[in-house]
Amino acid sequence: MASQFINLKSRLLNPYVVFAVWMLCTVWICITQSLAGPQNYNNFLVFRGVFDHLFSSLPLYEPYPLEYGDINHYGPIFAFIIAPFAVLPPWLGMSLWCMSLSLLLYWTVRQLPMPVVLTSLVLWLTLNDFYGACFKQQFNIAVAALVVGALAMIEKRREGWAALFIVIGTFVKIYGIVGLAFFFFVRRKGRFIGYMALWSAMALLLPLLFVSPEYLWSQYAAWAADIVQKNGENMFCAYTNISLVGCVRKISGSPAYSDLLIIVPAMVLFLLSYLRTGQYKHFSYRLTMLASLLLFIVLFSSGSEHSGYVIAALGMGIWWVNFPPPARGRLEWTLLLLALFASFSYNLLPTKFYRGVFVAYALRSLPFFAIWLHCIRRLWREDFAVTDVLLDYITLPAADEAANEAAESRPARPGDGLDIVCPCYNPAPGFVPALARSYAELCARYPDKRLHLIVVNDGSTDG
């Protein structure tokens, strides 16, 4: 039975299986939505309208009831992102848009320098919320992908791509600006700042090739006013403000206070984690920072919708896989199961309770808030040198780069690789964390060496 479970687990985490399931879900959405007709892909029609209206110099933030329901809330630069899909027949443009969102999120998660089985598990944990967001053609999928992609490109020292992802996310939906939180992890900061300035200038000036400056500046002003107005409308809206700030607002029933009373303390809690500068070098620390940012976007925004939880679910998935299995206790399992229950709540809860209580009071946010607090606690207290080793992040970035530079500057010589044999007979409690910490210290001390840790065990219980 145990071997069958292991075989099933290995098959489910196989990247080809994950990709096949991911794309089958996307294709199913494209087919069903196309056959259902335009009334089922209204969001895409709104996006398409941004392209048509900008190039006709029409207002971007006013209703067009003859074209679609709802109003656009994205920045003017979005017209250029949606352009390749807007010129196609609506059903085809919608299908390719969903396919592009799907591939973008899948690709960016796979770009994280993690073992393949871990990125596969992240995708599985995100799948249900991805399906809901893709069903509504939501740009939130791209927001999640751009934030993850920014860190992935920083890890690969591709500052230009990282800056581009942050600029696109910021100029389309503001949320992308959280990618700047990774600035302290950038090795070539001057290069990164230069690319940020370049891409920002292009995002601001590109529309001027097609519209007048007066029109463009008026639309940016209208966008700012729309964001403020939308924030007020979201306050007690049933199907928006599905966030922690919305939960507190709807339970209290009071419109008198500012959301900043909740957001500012949360920002302080998050920013305090930057004081642990010695942890910056550990990839698991940076991953925990990424998870907390993805959760923060949803938990502390009045614009959070159910489809926006693809961002929080991705954060939850990254939080989960960034745990060494021995560290997953009852608390961690409880938080994971509660978050998954919230994700499937539409199918699991009675309709009356779901709409009248669960949605009405934004209760979906609570397990994700608990996970965010868990991330903050880890950022404050954990020794991520141990986590890096236990999670097989063994080729630490600094050591890996130093070894590559050494290999380029001279031919490989005997002694570049070192085998460390560690007898392990009836180990004392705490042996594994101590061993991991020592190994991490050796990696830092000998960055030009390839260290291979060989643990010899006689089959004793704790080995």
Predicted segments — roles?
Residues A2-W161, V186-Y309, A313, F384, ...:
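Primarily membrane-embedded glycan-assembly and transfer machineries that use lipid-linked glycans
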Residues Q33, W320-A398:
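Aromatic-enriched
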Residues D416-D419, H452:
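Cell-envelope/extracellular polymer assembly enzymes that use nucleotide-activated donors
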Residues C422-C424, N457:
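Short beta-strand/turn micro-motifs composed of small residues
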Residues P427-Y446:
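Short, well-formed alpha-helical segments that are part of the catalytic scaffolds
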Residues N457-G463:
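A conserved acidic beta->alpha catalytic loop
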